Swiss-Prot record:
One Gene Ontology biological process: rRNA processing
Lineage top rank: taxon: Bacteria
E.C. number: 3.1.-.-
InterPro entries membership: MetalPrtase_cat_dom_sf_prd, YbeY, YbeY_CS
Residues annotated for Zn(2+) binding in this entry: H147, H151, H157
Protein name: Endoribonuclease YbeY
Family in the record: Belongs to the endoribonuclease YbeY family.
Co-factor binding comment: Binds 1 zinc ion.
Known role: Single strand-specific metallo-endoribonuclease involved in late-stage 70S ribosome quality control and in maturation of the 3' terminus of the 16S rRNA.
Gene: ybeY
Gene3D superfamilies in the cross-refs: Metalloproteases ('zincins'), catalytic domain
Length: 190
């Protein structure tokens, strides 16, 4: 497991009381911004996300070291606004990814870290889906973080072939985290 350090920004550096945490490791620097109070009930969410991103970064055939990404933990109202503004869909969703533009030339040693992009995750939708699918909150959060990360590095699921490739990689990453297949049907309760 990578060496993890966590520091919270001083209150004067935060906007409007938002909790702002930077987590650093040998894999991408992951900035987590909590913008919805409902996330405060999930004290370990940041650590779950970091572990999922670090594991995913270590398993993909892409250079993600010395890169950065930002994850916004929001609510259904916040993600609905993003979904409407960026995708034209006026409804909440579980996760949205916004990949950054890729550099056109070589990266030089003095260049700033490259930005992979941004991910937004909606608390209520995540919580509801986890319950409906009989998954733990942390397992579903890990899945959504991995799913969003894979979008940032170029994976997609627009075609059956793309979906098969992306879902297979998600299963492998989540298995490494000890999380069951997220696409398997939920077990029946008797």
């Amino acid at each position: 497991m990578p060496n993890i350090t966590c520091r919270e920004q001083p209150a004067r550096a935060r906007r409007g009381g938002e909790k702002h945490i930077m987590i650093r490791s040998a894999t991408p620097v992951t900035e987590i911004l909590v913008v919805a109070d409902c996330w405060r009930a999930e004290a370990g969410a940041e650590a779950v996300i970091h572990r999922a991103i670090a594991t995913a970064a270590g398993m993909v055939d892409k250079d993600t070291g010395d890169a950065e990404l930002a994850i916004m933990l929001t609510d259904d109202a916040g993600i609905r606004t993003l979904n409407a503004n960026w995708r034209g869909l006026d409804k909440p969703t579980n996760v949205l990814s916004f990949p950054a533009l890729q550099p056109t030339g070589p990266c030089l040693p003095d260049d700033p870290p490259r930005m992979l992009g941004d991910i937004a995750i909606a608390y209520e939708t995540l919580r509801r889906e986890a319950g409906d699918e009989r998954k733990t909150f942390d397992h579903h959060l890990s899945h959504l973080a991995v799913h969003g990360f894979l979008h940032l590095i170029g994976y997609d699921h627009e075609t059956d072939g793309e979906a098969e490739e992306m879902e297979s990689l998600e299963r492998q990453i989540l298995a490494q985290l000890g999380i069951p297949d997220p696409y398997a049907p939920p077990e029946r309760m008797t």
